[in-house]
């Protein structure tokens, strides 16, 4: 379970499902609706996978152990987000499971009360009946389930504690009056457990800093991964007297505070339109110099070159002709 999940009724229903299967998954979305009705574009599921790994149910069995062994072998080196290599942390690997296991071994739950989350708020409506929370399809009112758990993914939890609502992952999410009620309920639960909440929300990620306190950025991680794949050996990359940190320091790719680069998106990039215009004018000039064929060959090359992993030539000249994977 992810730590941002809140249960509203007994998990006994989940154990009953596991009596009849060995592996239990919940899809991000479960209903066919007209294009454009969802709060996030449908093609996002091609990137992050059809099943949400905020929840996964397993029963000790041969097939579950087989799956865990298979999964473990892949997560050792391929548990991160990289659209170029079609990876999305531990989650996207689950798309393989329906091809591996029979319906008796693997159950895909269509219970609307499981894994209610921002990505499916548009298809699920919360309502109260006999002092219990239920959920039904917004387009098919006859279908309903008891609310088991809600996954409050992507919210600013400090804002929820103050009574506000900020969804950081789906920027243009619609306001649903029924969802506002369960957001308020979660905020109230945070306040009721404020000491525990404040303690854990203030903790910093143990592997987010080098031994001298400088910040490990996403750029550093991806450069390190690339250099390891090229054969570099560094037993502890967090030590400032290690090979990797020494290369970063020498090339001035070290930051002392959290990098703004990690936070930048297309939506919050400052003066994006003005900078895009300037860049496009430069590319037009380059097109006039290179001509049609060489320009578009360059554009094709820039796809793999633009990956952070391909910038290892900045650290060591020996990668000047061997930096693209």
For each feature predicted by the language model, list its residue ranges.
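Glycosyltransferase catalytic domains, chiefly GT-A lineage
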Residues: 1-325
